[in-house]
Amino acid sequence: MSFIAIIPARYASTRLPGKPLADIAGKPMVVHVMERALASGADRVIVATDHPDVVKAVEAAGGEVCLTRADHQSGTERLAEVIEHYGFADDDIIVNVQGDEPLVPPVIIRQVADNLAACSAGMATLAVPIASSEEAFNPNAVKVVMDAQGYALYFSRATIPWERERFAQSKETIGDCFLRHIGIYAYRAGFIRRYVNWAPSQLEQIELLEQLRVLWYGEKIHVAVAKAVPAVGVDTQSDLDRVRAIMLNQ
């Protein structure tokens, strides 16, 4: 099964300026992500960036890169520009690999692409089990609940589902019903073309979760439990320091 991995790599991060070029073990972070995407078996890996310095770094590493506009509001909009630039067919499978996930397991990139190919949804994603009450009640850990066929019912920063009987007694322990959404997505190219024409939804603006726009407009998102748990992504300097330490010990 063939698929294309696209890595959005926005240069102007508020908390970590120039993040795609942050050095990790002698390579820019975006190059680490690109190498993991290539290891997944993707037919093609394209970095989508808004900055010429990122273009130079990717090309120096032998990668393929597309210079996009700087005014996109989301990574999905950046993907849409790349899809139109290359003229990908509507049924081509595109995997959005976050540019700040230098430790992303290649197996889950392949997994989310395979899952989309096997279902009728326009979009697929992954989740991992939540084992601690601290994570279950953390609004930065996005929870997802699914139906019997493995399609998302809802994503929320709130604690869903709510264990009424258990939590009436204590919130110190949780059951095995909680899943944390992880930010890797597969789409059919035609779905992205439709998506970018939809106005933002009320729910996504309340929760600040872009994927809720898909459910708002009546589309399905396939969800599966990831075969591997991704390590920390890079949002802050402390995250970057942790990733550098992990890489140093590998």
UniProtKB/Swiss-Prot annotation:
Metabolic or biological pathway: Nucleotide-sugar biosynthesis; CMP-3-deoxy-D-manno-octulosonate biosynthesis; CMP-3-deoxy-D-manno-octulosonate from 3-deoxy-D-manno-octulosonate and CTP: step 1/1; Bacterial outer membrane biogenesis; lipopolysaccharide biosynthesis
The keyword Nucleotidyltransferase is assigned to this record: yes
Protein localization: Cytoplasm
A GO CC term attached to the entry: cytosol
Superkingdom of this protein's organism: Bacteria
Molecular functions (GO terms): 3-deoxy-manno-octulosonate cytidylyltransferase activity
SUPFAM superfamilies: Nucleotide-diphospho-sugar transferases (SSF53448)
Record key words, sorted: Cytoplasm, Lipopolysaccharide biosynthesis, Nucleotidyltransferase, Transferase
Catalytic reactions of this protein: 3-deoxy-alpha-D-manno-oct-2-ulosonate + CTP = CMP-3-deoxy-beta-D-manno-octulosonate + diphosphate
Covalent S-S links between cysteines: none
EC number: 2.7.7.38
UniProt record, GO biological process: CMP-keto-3-deoxy-D-manno-octulosonic acid biosynthetic process; lipopolysaccharide biosynthetic process
InterPro entries: Cytidylyl_trans (IPR003329), KdsB (IPR004528), Nucleotide-diphossugar_trans (IPR029044)
Function: Activates KDO (a required 8-carbon sugar) for incorporation into bacterial lipopolysaccharide in Gram-negative bacteria.
Family of this protein: Belongs to the KdsB family.
Name of the protein this chain belongs to: 3-deoxy-manno-octulosonate cytidylyltransferase
Organism per entry: Yersinia pestis
Lineage, top ranks: Bacteria, Pseudomonadati, Pseudomonadota, Gammaproteobacteria, Enterobacterales
